Structures are given as C-alpha cells and as structure tokens.
Swiss-Prot record:
Highest taxon, organism lineage: Bacteria
Co-factor binding details: Binds 1 [4Fe-4S] cluster. The cluster is coordinated with 3 cysteines and an exchangeable S-adenosyl-L-methionine.
Gene Ontology MF, one: S-adenosyl-L-methionine binding
Protein name (database record): PqqA peptide cyclase
Quaternary structure and interacting proteins, as annotated: Interacts with PqqD. The interaction is necessary for activity of PqqE.
Taxonomic placement: Bacteria, Pseudomonadati, Pseudomonadota, Gammaproteobacteria, Lysobacterales
InterPro entries: 4Fe4S-binding_SPASM_dom (IPR023885), Aldolase_TIM (IPR013785), PQQ_synth_PqqE_bac (IPR011843), PqqE-like (IPR017200), Radical_SAM_PqqE_MftC-like (IPR050377), rSAM (IPR007197)
Length: 372
C-alpha cells in the first residue's frame, strides 16, 4: 500500500438535478438520476472519512445541491468534523428558508453562478425565466446573513464583452470575490464548443477588462481569471496535479480525480459503497494512473515545467487527441497544438449553432422551447 499526502478539499456532487440547463455545464452527458444518488448516511460517512484523512475543505455542489433536503444536515456534520464548508449554487432553488437552515448548520461561504448581466442573455443561457432577478434576491439574502459571497461568472462568445458589467454586478451585490472564468470544454461544454468558443480578440478584450478592474479596484474586490485553454501555449495543472490536491465524489458515490474523469474510457472508478476513501485515494487505479510524473511521455519528462503543469489535463488530452496518456494538446510542444488553435479560430469565426441544453435525454426540449 502506498500513502499519498491527503487531498486539500473534497467536492461533493450531491446531485445532477438542476433547475438550470446551461450549455457549458461540466457535468457528464450521462446525468445521474435521483434513484442513483447516494443517501444521507453515505454522504455523512464520506465526510467522516475525509476528515479522518486530513481533508480541510468540503465543497457542496451539483447539479444544484439545494435540491437535497438533507443539505443542512450534511453541512452541520461537516462543521462538527472541523471541515470548512462552501456551497456552490445557482441561487434559484431552496430560497431563504433553506438558507436560514444552512446558516444555522454552520455554512461558511457561498459561491453563486451568474450567466450574464443582461437579463435576456442570462435566461437564454440558463434556460430559466427571470434567472438574474432570482439570483439578485438570493445574493441579497446571503449578504443579509453575513455570509461571504463569491460570484462565478462563466464567459463565452455570447457574453465576453460584458466583463466590466459582471465586475460591477459583483460590487453591487457586495461580493468579496468574483471568478471570471472562460468556459472549460468538458461535458456539456464540449458538446456545445462551437456554440460557445470566443474569438482571440474577445479573449484579449476580457484580459484587458480584468486587468483594468484590478488596477482600479485594488483590494475592494478579489478578481480571479481563468482563460480558455484552446488559445493557450502552456496547459494548466489538472486540479493542481492529478490525484494530488483534490477529490471529487459523484452523485452515485464514485470517487474521481476530477469532475470530468469519467470521460476516460477503460479507467476503473471505485465507489464508496465498496471501498474506503483513503484506500481509493492511495491505491485506486484512477488516482495512481496519472499521479506524479512517471506516466508522462518523453516530451513531458524533459520539460522543466513538468512539476508545475503536471502534463496538463488528462480529460482534455483524451478529448482532443484520443489519448489520455499524452501531453495536453494545448501545450505548444504538442504535435497537434496548431490544430487545436485553428479549430478554436474556425469555430469562433463561424455562425454559432443552436445550444444543446443540459437536460436528461428524456426531458431534453428543443432549444426554442426552453423559454416559452
């Protein structure tokens, strides 16, 4: 048995159910049904095991975690175990009664997604009427209770020019931080890549908007910025390094090195119903496979950044090259790097196709029906 340093944080994807239908969602295409979700006892056990390992943070996510009636109980359990608790939410489910319960349970932070500052644009992306006004009310309720608030704003070709407005919204809503993140193309985001890909000019404009706001605002608002990989020369480290800092639990109880890992065919993902979290983290095939540097191809082995970017994203390597064990094709050392850039430029210059909205197949309406 090998012993790896414990992860810093655990992401609990409590459910794939969600009132929104965002076409950039990173959830898998095959969404877990309600009947497949792990029960309260299973999630409580997971939190206990995480605390016993030395994990410090528990992030409650989904789907929409506020659709789980046991969420306050799970937050209270995390608090009792000494885990920092963070809620990642759409803000359109649960309302103030649930928020009161979560505050009483010891919730320490809220991350609220915002699709756009333009109400019509927000509804179009979310597939949900009056989404922005609902989120505004939720943000006000969060701040009225004294909870720290982070705004998560996802960028794409349809809203990239509104970064200044998103930053202004974060200030208006009294957020302490905003994450301005370009779409990452996994799950539904990959399926909708051609509909979402911004141009290089749009990317440069978003960079300028963020840098300008940072200079003007100073410490009034923390601004994180995530670029789209397809225009990069160097890859980002996968979750701080595959199997090194982060562990993701799917609604079914599968233990994943990252939220998109299930796209890697042929890889075995262990389940908490069958094996302990510590054993999976230390010895599970999915975690050992790409942990460290021994797995890396020769071009990565000789790179001075091999322990900085850790070879980039395994899921992206698979999606773009067909091989999860090769270097991330967004790296300039990749033989298909130029093809990746060319694909992004071609897609962004072409008319955007209709969105494929994030819905279970049996519920998937036509795009034109989403807002009727």
């Amino acid at each position: 048995m090998s012993i790896a340093p414990p992860p810093l944080s655990v992401l609990l994807e409590l459910t794939h159910r969600c009132p929104l239908a965002c076409p950039y969602c990173s959830n898998p295409i095959a969404l877990a049904a309600l009947r497949e979700e792990m029960d309260t006892a299973g999630w409580r056990s997971l939190l206990q095991q995480a605390a016993d390992m030395g994990v410090l943070q528990a992030h409650f996510s989904g789907g929409e975690p506020m659709l789980r009636k046991d969420l306050p109980e799970l937050v209270a359990h995390a608090r009792a175990l000494g885990l920092y608790s963070n809620l990642i939410t759409s803000g359109v489910a649960g309302g103030e009664p649930m928020l009161d319960q979560l505050q009483a349970a010891g919730l320490e932070h809220v991350q609220l997604s915002v699709q756009d500052v333009d109400p019509a644009g927000a509804d179009r992306i979310a597939g949900y009427r009056n989404s922005l006004s609902r989120k505004r009310e939720f943000a006000a309720a969060v701040r009225a209770r004294g909870l720290p608030l982070t705004i998560n704003a996802v960028l794409h070709r349809h809203n990239a020019e509104r970064v200044p407005g998103m930053i202004a919204l974060a200030l208006e809503w009294q957020a302490e931080r905003i994450e301005v993140a370009h779409t990452q193309y996994y799950g539904w985001g990959l399926r909708n890549r051609a509909a979402l890909m911004p141009s290089r000019e749009q990317l440069l404009a978003t960079i300028d908007a963020v840098e300008t706001a940072r200079r003007q605002l100073g410490d009034r608002l923390a601004i994180d910025f995530v670029t789209p990989d397809y225009y990069a020369r160097q890859p980002k480290p996968c979750m701080g390094g595959w199997g090194q800092r982060f562990v993701n639990i799917s609604p079914r109880g599968d233990v994943l090195p990252c939220h998109a890992a299930e796209t890697i065919e042929g890889m075995r993902f262990d389940n908490l119903r069958e094996r302990s979290l510590a054993d999976i983290w230390n010895n599970g095939e999915a975690f050992v496979r790409f942990r460290g540097t021994a797995w890396m191809p020769e071009v990565c082995q000789g790179c001075p950044k091999r322990e900085i970017d850790w070879g980039g994203c395994r899921c992206q390597a698979l999606a773009l090259s067909g091989d999860a064990a090769t270097l991330d094709p967004v790296c300039e050392r990749s033989p298909i790097h130029a093809q990746v850039r060319a694909a992004a430029e071609q897609e962004s210059a072409s008319p955007a196709p209709a969105f494929v909205y994030r819905r279970p197949e049996r519920l998937a309406p036509a795009a034109a029906d989403m807002l009727e």
